[in-house]
Amino acid sequence: MPYVHVELFEGRTVEQKAIIAKEITESISKHAGAPTSAIHVIFNDLPEGMLYQGGEMKKKK
């Protein structure tokens, strides 16, 4: 039972997340052979100031 964690800056709608989750689920099922009912997609919305790369804060675009 695969668990896929997706971390994005805040601001995506429920509809956008549903599309992303569906496409991730279909891809994992196709390439890993897992049944879609066993695949879990978990979203973590990051507020600005919570993601740093190379010591520099990443900003929403």
UniProtKB/Swiss-Prot annotation:
It comes from Lactococcus lactis subsp. lactis (strain IL1403). InterPro entries: 4-OT-like_dom (IPR004370), Tautomerase/MIF_sf (IPR014347). Its EC number is 5.3.2.-. One of its GO terms (molecular function) is isomerase activity. The active site is at P2. NCBIfam families: PRK02220.1. It is an enzyme of class 5 (isomerase). Gene3D superfamilies: Macrophage Migration Inhibitory Factor. Keywords: Isomerase. Pfam families: Tautomerase. Belongs to the 4-oxalocrotonate tautomerase family. This is Probable tautomerase LL0574.
